[in-house]
Amino acid sequence: MSGIDDLPPLRDVIKRHDLSARKSLGQNFLLDLNLLTRIARAAGPLDGATVIEIGPGPGGLTRALLALGAAKVIAIERDERALGALQEIAAHYPGRLEIVCADATIYDPRPLLGGARAKIVANLPYNIATPLLIGWLSIEPWPPWYDTMVLMFQREVAERIVAREDDEAYGRLAVLANWRAETKLLFDISPAAFVPQPKVTSSVVRLVPRETPEPCDRRMLEQVAAAAFGQRRKMLRQSLKPLGVDPARLAAAAGVDPTRRAETIAVSGFVAMARELTDIRAIKSV
């Protein structure tokens, strides 16, 4: 038995269901139920909550979420080998675990939510983690169908999410993430906690969506950030040229010094430039 429920230890579950991790699916299984419980707790009170979990594998995090009182966990798993293990958990928690065998990069869970907001809590497969996050941050209209995300990434990716201006890791991902959410790196997890052991440290990040981010067109913001960070060592008056407008005038009109570099500009500066770009293009289209 485990320390959080009467189900078998995760190592036994993996052996019994022949769940050897597959590199092609980005799988690394976290087996320490204390760590898994810590991740689940980071999402805040779970009583009455609906939680979306991506890539549950043998179900360690699933069990932690249910043991902490989640009213419903919707587990989206692409690997059919894991379904047997998840069905055993579903039997232990009747009516509280819904298993969806699908590709999380294209599956839309909203029809299962009944209009309620959910939490997303997941040890994301490394190979789809960033695309999934960008998709969740790009949802329209905003605010989104979730109220909290607690996600595990490779440490390098986590640093890129929570970075601020003048940080080495600051870039396009940080601009999008911190425009639409409050982000925080919570804690690291050693490679030794996983089976098989990855070559890198993992980090758990919490993102809480801002109900009313600074107003601007997301696509324009992404274009400005892409241009600016595409030549991050150059001044904005040079790096913003791909936008097809006078870069110095664009930056100056937004209240940003065009001789500065992208890595020194706060998210609010990018938002201001995105709004200005929207106005310029609207005038041009008339």
Swiss-Prot record:
InterPro entries: KsgA/Erm, rRNA_Ade_diMease-like_C, rRNA_Ade_Mease_Trfase_CS, rRNA_Ade_methylase_Trfase_N, rRNA_adenine_dimethylase, SAM-dependent_MTases_sf. Pfam families: RrnaAD. It comes from Rhodopseudomonas palustris (strain BisB18). Its main location: cytoplasm. Its EC number is 2.1.1.182. Specifically dimethylates two adjacent adenosines (A1518 and A1519) in the loop of a conserved hairpin near the 3'-end of 16S rRNA in the 30S particle. May play a critical role in biogenesis of 30S subunits. S-adenosyl-L-methionine binds at N28, L30, G55, E77, D103, N123. Keywords: Cytoplasm, Methyltransferase, RNA-binding, rRNA processing, S-adenosyl-L-methionine, Transferase. NCBIfam families: ksgA. GO terms for molecular function: 16S rRNA (adenine(1518)-N(6)/adenine(1519)-N(6))-dimethyltransferase activity; RNA binding. This is Ribosomal RNA small subunit methyltransferase A. GO terms for cellular component: cytosol. The lineage of its organism: Bacteria, Pseudomonadati, Pseudomonadota, Alphaproteobacteria, Hyphomicrobiales. It catalyses: adenosine(1518)/adenosine(1519) in 16S rRNA + 4 S-adenosyl-L-methionine = N(6)-dimethyladenosine(1518)/N(6)-dimethyladenosine(1519) in 16S rRNA + 4 S-adenosyl-L-homocysteine + 4 H(+). The keyword Cell cycle does not apply. Belongs to the class I-like SAM-binding methyltransferase superfamily. rRNA adenine N(6)-methyltransferase family. RsmA subfamily. It is found in: Cytoplasm. The keyword RNA-binding applies.
